[in-house]
Design a protein with these regions (language model features):
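N-terminal intrinsically disordered/low-complexity leader segments
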Residues: 1-18, 190-198
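Helix-turn-helix
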Residues: 22, 26, 30-64, 68
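Amphipathic alpha-helical linker/stalk segments
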Residues: 29, 33, 64-92
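Alpha-helical DNA-contacting segments of helix-turn-helix folds
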Residues: 59, 64-73, 114, 123, ...
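Helical hydrophobic small-molecule/effector-binding pocket
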Residues: 64, 86-122
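Amphipathic alpha-helical packing segments from all-alpha helical-bundle domains
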Residues: 98-103, 118-146, 170-184
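Amphipathic C-terminal alpha-helical segment
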Residues: 145-168, 180-190
Length: 198
């Protein structure tokens, strides 16, 4: 009897985890493709083929669901970006643009509403800090870090890809040229300083 109960509990636990993941995946897809205000518990429930109460049981409310999606998505973003090697500007820009191809439009939508939704503002602040840390680690150009943050920001991607209508490869090339020019400027400035000290 105990063995049967143990099996039933494991089976229920596995089923609950599968349901949670299905809800999370559907919520992620919705938050990536729609405005924050358009994503409702009812919409997520319908896409996950569960009741709204099931979504609430797993995540508490919309903010809890959004926080879980952010945790899940942040792990994916960091995993993609961690493939970049320090000093490899072309490779880093390729990885960055590939990430923006997945998350860029959603990031732009979230940036548009962060001023009025505290949980979104917190998420975007964390994203800005993570991006700056990544730029510092990958480019290792302290004299032009602020500028590198700007030319590798999601807004730069949006201006090139969405507003100017450039293709992915053209966007990569443009962002790469800007980053390399900044790094070259710093390298030249450091070289000039060394010569003056002699």
């Amino acid at each position: 009897m105990k063995a049967q109960r143990s099996y039933d509990m494991r089976s229920r636990s596995a089923s609950a985890e599968a349901t949670r993941m299905r809800i999370l995946e559907q919520a992620q897809a919705l938050f990536l493709s729609r405005w924050y205000d358009e994503v409702t518990i009812a919409t997520v429930a319908a896409h996950a083929e569960v009741s709204g109460q099931t979504v609430l049981n797993h995540f508490g409310d919309k903010e809890g669901l959004f926080a879980a999606v952010v945790d899940h998505t942040s792990g994916e973003i960091l995993g993609r970006r961690d493939r970049a090697q320090p000093g490899d500007v072309p490779g880093a820009i390729e990885i960055l643009v590939d990430d923006y191809e997945i998350t860029g439009d959603a990031s732009i939508r979230l940036l548009a509403v962060e001023h009025r939704i505290a949980s979104v503002r917190k998420t975007m602040d964390t994203g800005r800090n993570n991006h700056r840390d990544w730029v510092e680690r990958i480019f290792a150009a302290p004299g032009v870090t602020d500028e590198l943050v700007v030319v590798t920001d999601v807004y730069a991607w949006k201006l090139l890809r969405r507003d100017r209508g450039l293709g992915r490869d053209e966007t990569v090339a443009s962002m790469r040229r800007m980053a390399e020019a900044l790094i070259q400027t710093q390298t030249s400035a450091e070289s000039t300083k060394r010569r003056r000290r002699r």
